[in-house]
């Protein structure tokens, strides 16, 4: 991917919906890229005041908080919107942005709540797909980990097995752990083997803080293992044809530095922050 500079996006106006959690990481990357963060959406005036004060203190950014997306769009006139809100309101925010012809960068899952049915999912996906102003990126940025290290991977064109392990200090339990973390492994798997709509021989094992599944993806034997608990340290490892790798992250001067450790070769490869790579691609798409 071609590298960017801060002047490339300096006149581009982006609004971020949701600040806590992943929203803060989006602001960190957008600030590094020189983007004009023209507004944020929060759930209340109190949380908005807290967010704008913290953003000013940590990133030196002066922005305005809104509690209404309509007001945010009308007043701040964003050229793109990053959706980092709770899953339950993704769909309504996406359509509202599309109605104003604003492209969307949406956090995963695209749409989800515990009571949603397959029929409702299909209906909402169809509404997104058929919208005349549909321009949307889903944050499956971990695919870029594979794309950036492909030249170092052994037998990448003849993958027989793929294992993915992800531990986080997230809040989800039981099957909801998979709804949160499954897209990370799937994005990497699709980067390796291309897309497929079928999983064969699917089996799963679920505990309160653990989710494990195995399945066949095309000709690849796949295993996913996820753990979530407030006391866990974040850890991501993956194994391709029994060769194990680990994603390493370090924050330095408000910049997320990412590398991949190859256990067999005893080497560490520096890569671009996957979220930054995906956001750059999205901004150029806009």
Residues of each region from the PLM?
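Receiver (REC) domain switch-region micro-motif
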Residues: 40, 81, 162
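Beta-loop-alpha module in the N-terminal Rossmann-like domain of NAD(P)-dependent dehydrogenases
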Residues: 16, 61-105, 109-125
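C-terminal helix-rich "cap/oligomerization" subdomain common to oxidoreductases
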Residues: 1-9, 16, 80-83, 135, ...
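N-terminal Rossmann-like dinucleotide-binding module
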Residues: 1-59, 283
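A contiguous active-site-proximal alpha/beta segment in oxidoreductase catalytic domains
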Residues: 88, 111-170
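NAD(P)-dinucleotide binding in Rossmann-like oxidoreductases
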Residues: 204-208, 217-280
